[in-house]
Amino acid sequence: MNIPPELTFEVLVRLPLKSLARFRSVRKEWKLVIDSEFFRDCFMSHNSSSVSWSIIQTRPHKLTLEIVGHHGCKTWGLTRSPGSLVGFFADTTIKRLRVLACTDGLVLIYTETSYGTPMHYVGNPLFQEWCPIPLPSYFYLQSVERIRNHQRFNDSALVIKMQSGAVVSYKVVWLFPRNSTTIDFLIYSSDTGMWEARIATCLHSSFWFSHHKPIALNGILHWLCNFSTSFVAYDFYGGHDDYACHIISFPDCEKDDDQLRRFRRTLSTSDGSIVYFNEFGENGNRRLRVWRLVKYTGGPEAWQLFWEVSLASVTKLGIDYFPVVMHPLKSEIIYLWSRNKKGMVLFNLRTNVFSLHKESEDETKCMDGCTLSFNRCSEYMETIHNYGGPNYLLASQYVLPRWLHRLPRPQPS
């Protein structure tokens, strides 16, 4: 029976990506429809409100990587959280495996064979596609030993180039602080399959790097530092004209704001931007301020204050909390961890409505319509609460893309 093309289109565009991936491999006609730009644009316009994502912790060698998962959204139609889908199957015996970075649906992992050979892979866990990343041909023996001895995990990162909602390129980045003013980058590109060495200027680079894992967004890596009121950013897809890192001051680095600020500084991402948030107390009032990074400069014009709300609705319940992340798509939702309630508070900044979700409870629906699940989240939150320093990356997000994409691979020469 021949199905009219118009009906095929209307049926397919209402299916989740999980089903589209299966139908795409069944019939050539369906594949042609799904792969068209018009179909992709229609699908994304119908599914712009929610997507599966995870809150991941920054110490994966101590606990599980995913501490909070979101699944069951309309876009993907997953019945499990994204973190539970991260699996790796090798042809040889693996004695050690570690997830180094997650961004835009791709994962960078480190493995070590039973013979002690270190290997890195970039993969798409949903489709079980993995690409081995070769070591640079000029890599020194002592550098390999540093990898084997687990001294290079905070220095590894993954940046992505997106186009029309799909990943078209990625870069694996290794960092080697050289001295107080320069940093060496080793960069592997999926476009060329080659490594590139790059030297960038950065003030006090030995203090910036290796202390925290970076946050990747739009091909840019962002690093916090415990010793400064600023953070560092570097654009790996910005061309070769600018070899300098951007040093960006936090919007509350003035003395008066610093005295009123309650929490350590941290960064998150939301709605395509880097965001910074904190609580400020003045005259007995507690208010939450959220800034969006709009320019990669060092002055006050770098930030836009787009939320300032009273915390009376939260604090009247006696909730002792600290901020964790923003919702990656909905910039009005912030995630707070309540220590005395031992649960995650989802606070809507627009409506001042909040909901409390406990790890001990069954999976529940959250504000974006996804199903919320926990995995040793309470244990991790108690651990990081005791960490010192004025700045700290508490957690980051692993967000699945809004469209199907295969793993980018180098073009054959």
UniProtKB/Swiss-Prot annotation:
<dbReference type="Pfam" id="PF24750">
    <property type="entry name" value="b-prop_At3g26010-like"/>
</dbReference>
<feature type="domain" description="F-box">
    <location>
        <begin position="1"/>
        <end position="42"/>
    </location>
</feature>
<protein>
    <recommendedName>
        <fullName>Putative F-box protein At3g23970</fullName>
    </recommendedName>
</protein>
<dbReference type="InterPro" id="IPR001810">
    <property type="entry name" value="F-box_dom"/>
</dbReference>
<dbReference type="InterPro" id="IPR036047">
    <property type="entry name" value="F-box-like_dom_sf"/>
</dbReference>
<dbReference type="InterPro" id="IPR056592">
    <property type="entry name" value="At3g26010-like_b-prop"/>
</dbReference>
<dbReference type="InterPro" id="IPR050796">
    <property type="entry name" value="SCF_F-box_component"/>
</dbReference>
